């Protein structure tokens, strides 16, 4: 069983990801991360999964999540994942980032495009982009 955490689970991409993962027998979602709905049941926000989910939404603590999840999905705006990821987190878990934080290999292009400073350029070279 693959233990998965989703940071940004109540946004459009995160909720769709949760819906898809809930259909798999080999995945257990152990963390529904949401800044807006901390403490509220995920199923009260998305009624279509009420019969399958009885977990509350938790905060966006990637450090804590990395201690219990095999894989962390971040379905968050640009800048979030890069600002949170550390070498310690990467030594414990895999991260699949749905934003563009590690999509572009050129930090200057990223910073020009998104108008933010990339917080973890040291991880760009080892990141893998998949579509």
Question: Where are these predicted regions, by residue range?
Answer:
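N-terminal Rossmann-like NAD(P) cofactor-binding subdomain of oxidoreductases
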Residues: 1-131
């Amino acid at each position: 069983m693959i233990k998965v955490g989703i940071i940004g689970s109540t946004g459009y991409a995160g909720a769709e990801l949760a819906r898809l993962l809930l259909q798999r027998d080999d995945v257990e979602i152990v963390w529904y991360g949401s800044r807006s709905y901390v403490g509220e049941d995920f199923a009260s926000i998305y009624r279509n999964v009420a019969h399958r989910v009885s977990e509350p939404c938790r905060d966006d603590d990637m450090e804590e999540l990395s201690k219990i999840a095999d894989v962390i999905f971040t379905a968050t705006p640009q800048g979030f994942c890069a600002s949170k990821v550390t070498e310690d987190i990467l030594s414990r878990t895999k991260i699949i980032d749905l934003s563009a934080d590690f999509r572009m290999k050129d930090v200057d292009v990223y910073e020009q495009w998104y108008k933010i400073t990339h917080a973890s350029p040291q991880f760009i070279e080892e990141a893998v982009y998949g579509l």
